[in-house]
A protein has these predicted regions:
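Aromatic- and acidic-residue-enriched segments that line the glycan-binding/catalytic groove
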Residues: 2-32, 70-95, 146, 275
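Active-site-adjacent "subsite" loops/lids of carbohydrate-active enzymes
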Residues: 2-60, 98-101, 112-113, 300
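Carbohydrate-binding surfaces of carbohydrate-active enzymes
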Residues: 97-137, 142-302
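Contiguous N-terminal and early-domain "leader" segments and peripheral loops that mark the onset or edge
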Residues: 1-2, 258
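Active-site neighborhood of glycoside hydrolase catalytic domains
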Residues: 41-145
Length: 302
């Protein structure tokens, strides 16, 4: 997790993002104690993060490394001394939230470029993905740094059942291999005591296959440090059925008859980019229920 780290939060408060009032930023609204104070990627943490990556690659060994998935990377309305200085160097208005969010997007793109170059200098064949819980037009400029796309979307965990149908129909037009990502949990990440019912998990995975995506079912290691047999029995049962369908789902391209322009492209710069507009949700529902094959596009797509 790139921008959440409990140890960093405790030991290096000078690396944390702060809002316009000088308060640490907690985007999750979780009561203390927690580890959700967001880290600023403009701070000394960036070198610490690169040192961690280098140590990990050296310990694992390049020959054993498939790829690196970096989680929790998103725009933050940060007004720390590092961001203020960089904005001033670019002639940007540090008192404007719109300008701060515009700079946050620029800085995040620049961070991804630097980290991808750093990783590939040591592990040229490693796959790379930066997860911000959503794949949409706002992140499009940085997708050149991704080897593939992973669409995190837990229907019962905050994303809802409308998120994946819309996002996948946009992401499949970006020229990257695409994987759908759900979880084995009944609700959200970290819901350790629960298992999603098999029918729901099958629906999610079969939906991934139907839109041309691979399947990923996420888990987290229980604090006891032992994998849950029940979880992997569940996942195994679902993947057994997925395996039977895989020969028909490789190297596929959707044959669509309708294109819908996403309003995300035109959101205000200070708007949250992971929230789908009601108009898009309604359009996707109607077209799905009528049985049409369609894509979600932006204005730059052919």
């Amino acid at each position: 997790t790139a921008q959440w780290d409990g140890r960093i939060m405790r030991e290096h408060p000078e690396w944390l993002a702060v809002d316009e009032n000088g308060e640490f930023i907690d985007t999750q609204g979780v009561p203390a104690p927690h580890f959700y104070h967001t880290i600023c990627l403009n701070s000394g943490y960036r070198q610490f993060f690169k040192d961690q990556l280098q140590d990990m690659i050296e310990v694992i060994g390049v020959e054993n490394l498939d790829g690196i998935f970096m989680d929790i990377l998103f725009q933050v309305d940060c007004k720390c001394e590092h961001c203020v200085r960089k904005m001033q160097e670019l002639g940007m208005d540090t008192e404007s939230k719109v300008e701060r969010m515009r700079y946050a997007e620029h800085m995040l793109d620049e961070f991804k470029t630097e980290i991808s170059e750093f990783i590939h200098s040591m592990a040229p064949e490693a796959t790379i993905f930066y997860n911000g819980s959503h794949v949409g037009p706002r992140s499009k400029n940085s997708f050149k740094e991704y080897s593939h796309l992973e669409l995190e979307s837990l229907p019962s965990g905050g994303w809802g059942y409308d998120h994946f149908p819309a996002t996948s129909r946009y992401a499949r037009n970006l020229g990257k291999e695409m994987i759908g990502m759900t979880g084995k949990f009944h609700t959200y990440w970290g819901d350790f005591h629960s298992l999603k019912n098999q029918a729901a998990l099958e629906y999610e995975c079969f939906h991934m296959l139907a839109v041309g995506a691979g399947c990923s079912i996420g888990d987290q290691l229980h604090p006891r440090g032992v994998l849950s047999k029940g979880a992997y029995d569940l996942i195994g049962n679902v993947y057994k059925s997925v395996e039977e369908k895989e020969p028909y789902c490789r190297d596929v391209k959707a044959r669509t008859e309708i294109a819908v322009i996403t309003p995300e492209e035109f959101y205000p710069e200070d708007a949250k980019d992971s929230v789908l507009s009601p108009s898009l949700i309604g359009t996707v529902r109607i077209l799905q229920e009528l049985g049409y094959q369609f894509d979600i596009i932006d204005s730059q797509m052919p």
